[in-house]
Amino acid sequence: MTKNKGLIIILSSPSGAGKSSLAKALLEIDHNLRLSISATTRKPRPNEQDGVNYYFKTKVEFEKLVKQNQFLEHAKIYDNYYGTPKKHVENLLNQGLDVLFDIDWQGARSIKQNAVNAVSIFILPPNLEVLEQRLRNRAADNEEAIQLRMASAQAEISHSNEYDHIITNDDFNDTIQQIHTIILQERKKRN
């Protein structure tokens, strides 16, 4: 009996809506999930490790990988490049593991156009005031960066209708359960 290929599960949201925390929690409760690790040209945040959180690349290195067609998708966001390396994802899917993507709407659109086994979930903040407070509380960005993220949040949210599912993250544990239920249902459909 051949093993089924894994699913691609896409989580997207405006910056600060909780998708990275949700992804981490999902990985802890579902042992068939693996996180897709993106490459980026942005500087590492405190406690981020190369090859664990991201593959940190220079702009020249990143552009070389683009020319070599090494990404499933790539985009420029907030003056930095982000992309999903193909090889690692393909290896996981071929093992029957599900791959969780923590990416923006541009990457989600690109993957959905090219993958038949993808399910997309958009995470909304309860409102924009809560979103701004979350960005300020994480203290990772200066005021200019926070304002840039808030300005782009509306544009990001405007693409939520392109997703298979939309969930408002007003209760973290409830949101985890909603996402996990979607994943379990998608597995049943495909098996």
Curated annotation (Swiss-Prot):
Annotated positions binding ATP: S13, P14, S15, G16, A17, G18, K19, S20
Molecular function GO labels: ATP binding; guanylate kinase activity
Positions of the Guanylate kinase-like domain: 6-184
Annotated GO CC locations: cytosol
The EC number(s) this enzyme carries: 2.7.4.8
Entry keywords, A to Z: ATP-binding, Cytoplasm, Kinase, Nucleotide-binding, Transferase
Cell location: Cytoplasm
Main location (coarse class): cytoplasm
Transmembrane segments: none
Reactions this protein catalyses: GMP + ATP = GDP + ADP
PROSITE patterns (alphabetical): GUANYLATE_KINASE_1, GUANYLATE_KINASE_2
Entry superkingdom: Bacteria
Pfam families per UniProt: Guanylate_kin
Cited function: Essential for recycling GMP and indirectly, cGMP.
Family: Belongs to the guanylate kinase family.
PANTHER family: GUANYLATE KINASE, GUANYLATE KINASE-RELATED
Protein name (database record): Guanylate kinase
Organism: Rickettsia bellii (strain RML369-C)
